[in-house]
Regions:
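Glycine-rich phosphate-binding loop of ATP-dependent small-molecule kinases
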Residues: 1-182
Length: 182
């Protein structure tokens, strides 16, 4: 089993590169964003709560995210046998520590963290373009600025956390999809 965290700012290409890694290595993909958007679309209790945070560009509380993740892993035991790529999680050091505990209970660990590093102007351009193409409500300029501020304040410290754990691998995320994957 090989578990990978794909790390980067909103719009850095986490979802796109996750798809490439999944196809190449056969890992099970967990996008906490996709899981949450599914709950929002189905108007579940979790979806209603999550939507309040997402629509304001805020992070979902750690305890709630851990519960969602654990439930999702429990429901996909067979699919995750080769390993998991975590896309959009963890986003805080507390979540990283909780993920470590969760995986240790399952006899495994985070093996690598792929950090997609993209300059901020490119991030804004990508996100606004994605918003136009997909109609995602959280891909507008005001929310993008909030999401990037939250990323810098709350998520960026994870980079050093995983560097200290000797698991962080920085990748220049400014190129084409193919050049980034290589």
């Amino acid at each position: 089993m090989f578990n990978v965290v794909i790390f980067g700012a909103p719009g850095s290409g986490k979802g796109t590169q996750s798809e490439r890694i999944i196809d190449h290595y056969g890992l099970f993909h967990i996008s906490t964003g996709d899981v949450l958007r599914d709950h929002i679309a189905r108007n579940t209790e979790l979806g209603v709560i999550a939507n309040k945070y997402i629509s304001q560009g805020q992070l979902i509380p750690d305890e709630l995210m851990i519960r969602v993740l654990e439930h999702h892993l429990d429901n996909h035991t067979k699919e995750s046998e080769k390993g998991v790529i975590f896309d959009g999680f963890p986003r805080t050091i507390a979540q990283a520590k909780a993920l470590t505990e969760l995986l240790e209970k399952r006899g495994t660990q985070v093996d690598a963290v792929v950090g997609l590093e993209v300059n901020e102007d490119e991030l804004v351009t990508r996100i606004l373009k994605r918003g136009q193409e997909t109609g995602r409500s959280d891909d507008n300029l005001e929310t993008v600025k909030k999401r990037l501020a939250v990323y810098h304040n709350q998520t960026c410290p994870l980079r050093q956390f995983y560097i200290d754990e000797k698991k962080y691998h920085a990748i220049d995320g400014n190129g084409t999809v193919d050049s980034i994957f290589e």
